[in-house]
Every structure is written in structure tokens, then in C-alpha cells.
């Protein structure tokens, strides 16, 4: 057939592509319904399983330690620490789903529709809550350093309300996954877990992808760029060396988040534009998108275990807090404790909770 002159709709008019949806979690294509025969359905599945297993172990251990250190230090807990506590909780909840995703890479989705919805929801909530919490941290740092404001963020009930609101908004943004994900069975391939919106799939895809990505990624990203831009300018102008050093942890956390999730978001945007025919779809482009989705998804999954490593290597206060816990329980000598062991990851904050 002539790939240049005919559209895919004309070439495959007799086929039903209403359920042909590219999931962020499981097989990006189903050979019996896809307009192109994929060159490669997925990255080597056993390689992916090994990565998932390592991320699961590192995330489980690392985020548990982060939560332990923050929860143990009630007196010196800063506003930023509360946000980081919720960030660790989100990563930990997602990590608990990784064994299920790993098994599905080998055997297909054998866990039914209920678990399909639950683990997909946890992944989306982890993504949205992560960037929303980072946006809140950027606002907190902006108020504390640029405006020297303490009154807005030092009240405990307000910080708790903000965190609860972030979880609620993240659930709302992830609601399409909860509503439309299900186990899909197709001939010649293993069962899969992905969105199924029936005959309205094409009509809803743009709305259900672009809106959550806009409000759950682009808007918080713009907030962070604004806040950290002015924060950095203030730090350099005032030569606030100590606070500048304390901000290294937060900047590292934000940078790692963007490096892990921005590529996936861009590829998902390209996939959405292609599926809604804003960008012409060809077999070559389809295969490139498939491979990019697989690769960038793995990069995003890696993020759930990286924050504790940042705290361990860059966050001096986290190391001090962990050593303090070990000393209290007699695992190390108290003489090895540093003089300043306040367990706040980022130094002074705009308030304490």
C-alpha cells in the first residue's frame, strides 16, 4: 500500500482501533489491533525485571529510613521536612507495586482489573504528588528567603492542610486511570492493563492526557522555575553562603525529578499528538515512540529510589539524624555524633511543625 498517499483510517477501515491505547505501564501496542507490526514490543523483559527489583529494594530501604529520621525528630522538624516526608511516603507506596509490575513484564497482566486500577493509580498519584510537593517546597523557600516570611507557613494546621490538599488533587488528576484502566485480553498476546474507553477513546484521549499533564506537571514546573529563580538571585545578591549550601539538597531533588520524569512526559505528549492525528503517524514514528515510552518509563521508575541517595550523599542533616537514631539505640557510640545533629534536611526553614 502507499504509505504517503493514504491515511491509516482509510487503510484499516475494516478494523476496530477504538481500544488501541498506549499505556504508560504495560505493553505499548497490541499486534492484533495495531496499524503497524511493531519492530520490538518491549525492552528485554528480564533486564526490566532486574531493574524493577533493584529499585524496589533501594526504594523500600531508603524511603523507610527517610520517614524514620523525619518522624523521629519532632522538635526540629521544618516545613520542608514535612513535604519531604510526604514525598518519601509517595515513593514508598509506589515501590510496593513494583513486584506486581515486574511480574507483569514476564507473564502479562494476570492480576485482574482491581489490581490493575490500584497499582496504576498509585503510580499516577506518585508522579503528581511528587511535583506538587516540590512546588510547595519551592514556594516555602521563596517566602523564607526572598520575603523572609514566616507567618504563612509556620502554622502546623496549615502545612497539614496543604499536604492533604496535594494528596486530594493528585487523586483527582489520576482519576481517569482509576475509571478506565482494566485488564484487556487479546489474541496472540498476553493480557494487558491499560485504558479502555470504548468507542470514545480517540475523543477523550487528548482531554484525559493533556489536562492532567498541564495542571499536574507544567503548572507546578512553572511555579518552581519562578520561585527558585528569585530565590537564587536573592542568595547570590545577599551572599547568603550558608543558606545557599543548604539549598543544594532541594535543588538536587528537583533536578533529579525533572531528569527522570520530563523525558517521559515529553514522549507521552508526542504519543498523544500522534494518536489525535496532530502529528502524522507512520510505522517508523510509531516504533520510535514505543521504544521511547519503554525507556523513559524505566527512567521515571528509577526516581522512586533516588531521593534517599541524594539525602545520604548531599544532605548532611539527614546523615546526622540517622546517626543520632543509631546512637540512641546503642548501635553506634554517642561520641561519634557531630555537635550539630538537627535532623532537618535543608537547614533553616520558614517555620517548624
Swiss-Prot record:
Gene3D superfamilies: Rhodopsin 7-helix transmembrane proteins. The chain crosses the membrane at residues 46-72, 82-102, 118-139, 161-180, 206-228, 249-270, 292-312. Residues 73-81, 140-160, 229-248, 313-353 are cytoplasmic. Disulfide bonds join 116-193. It is found in: Cell membrane. One of its GO terms (cellular component) is external side of plasma membrane. Its main location: membrane. It holds the Pfam family 7tm_1. InterPro entries: CCR1-9-like, Chemokine_CXCR2, Chemokine_CXCR_1/2, GPCR_Rhodpsn, GPCR_Rhodpsn_7TM. GO terms for biological process: calcium-mediated signaling; immune response; neutrophil chemotaxis; positive regulation of cytosolic calcium ion concentration. PANTHER family: C-X-C CHEMOKINE RECEPTOR TYPE 2, CELL ADHESION MOLECULE. Belongs to the G-protein coupled receptor 1 family. Interacts with IL8. Interacts with GNAI2. Receptor for interleukin-8 which is a powerful neutrophil chemotactic factor. Binding of IL-8 to the receptor causes activation of neutrophils. This response is mediated via a G-protein that activates a phosphatidylinositol-calcium second messenger system. Binds to IL-8 with high affinity. Also binds with high affinity to CXCL3, GRO/MGSA and NAP-2. This is C-X-C chemokine receptor type 2.
